[in-house]
Amino acid sequence: MTVYSGSTNCEVTLGMNNARAPFNNKLVRQAVRQAINKKNLIKTAWSGYGLEIGSFVPPTDPWYEDLSTLYPYDVNKSKALLKSAGYANGLTINLDLPPIAYATNSGEFIAASLAKVGIKVNLKPIAWGEWIDRVFTKKDYDMTIVCHIESNDMAIYANPAYYFGYNSTTYQGLIKKAASAKTQAARVENLKKAARLLADDSVSDWLWLIPNLQVAKKTISGIPLNTVGDAYTVDRITVG
């Protein structure tokens, strides 16, 4: 048997509520990002399968840029950022975990990681109904984890009413320019700028990209590695 590992659109996202303290402070959001060792998280939560991406773009999109090293794991830097943000004595936040493996598998690791820099995390396992009502709709949360799988979905960060609570006129302008671009090159350039701005602002932390894992007999070839939607293409698969 052969194991095939490709990519998907599913960005496992550590959402931070930009609309209220403490995550209305960019320094705190950046501190969270630099407190989490993504490689070790992927090993712990997803058996080592997954791609660090650094922003809200999968590698199958033309505007993808590897931004995973923009804010690298650095405990001392994370502590310094919290001190600069006014949290030298630490802080306490809640992390809402919906009932799905990538979230529940990540909770303890993230809590332990943030504890090392002075952030106490109360883990809150919740049902999907509560997540949709309280977190997604009412935006009553501090942090949460969910996988965003929609194609070309960067526009959700351009909506201040969306549950991330991110309100950047610069970002909104880039998304509008991309949508009205007359050439593909112009669209790609504006979306690259938008993705970098998301990363620069540490709006969320993109923990990893869920891989497309498949197992097939060695006599089978032409397996499509990557998936960008619900369709599964079989016209190039051969046996023998």
What are these regions (language model features)?
Residues 44-45, 68, 94-101:
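Short beta-strand->loop
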Residues 26, 75-94:
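Immediate post-signal peptide segment of exported/extracytoplasmic ligand-binding proteins
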Residues 19-28, 70-71, 88, 180-181:
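Short helix-loop capping/hinge motifs at secondary-structure junctions, enriched
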Residues 33-63, 102-111, 132-240:
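Detector for C-terminal structural segments
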Residues 6-31, 44, 159-161, 175-176, ...:
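A bilobed periplasmic-binding-protein/Venus flytrap-type ligand-binding module shared by bacterial periplasmic
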Residues 88-95, 112-126:
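A local structural motif
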Residues 75-81, 97-110:
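Bilobed "Venus flytrap"/periplasmic-binding protein-like clamshell domains
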Residues 99-101, 123-133:
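Short helix-initiation/N-cap motifs at beta->coil->alpha
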